[in-house]
Amino acid sequence: LLRKGVGSFFFLAEIICNLELEPDQQQTDHCGECTACIDACPTQAIVQPQVIDSNRCISYLTIEDKTWPESNEITKTESWAYGCDICQDVCPWNKFSQPNQEPRFAPREMISWDNSQWEQTLVEPARIKSQLKKSAMQRAGLKKLIAQIDLALKYRPE
């Protein structure tokens, strides 16, 4: 889903109401012949233009899949502990995106942690728990995040 001048970095929302509303006009497909996201996806989760097999998607596996990381798809995520935005990163429309100015969406301290700091979370889970306060990352659950951090560290270069 793309917005001209913004790209694909935005939140979706819905409003539930009982009003009769006219539907918006269908948006133009701005992708054209571009396959950058399809080509870049490490798990081939984008199976054709505008079709995602969520069961292959690293974001789904690391956030939503309750059997992860016990399932047999472990090598697909390699050094990813939570989520993935590769498809977003390679989208040419995102060169127009601007960093969000909302303080609640600012990167947390842990974004710049090195391997030793991540390893510390394995012996001291409270370290990451404090970083997750009021974060969407809580959705995955602390136990799952710790398991994924452990897994990601095994694949992450020093």
Give the residues covered by each predicted segment.
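Alpha-helical scaffold domains
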Residues: 68-158
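Catalytic cores of enzyme domains
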Residues: 1-110
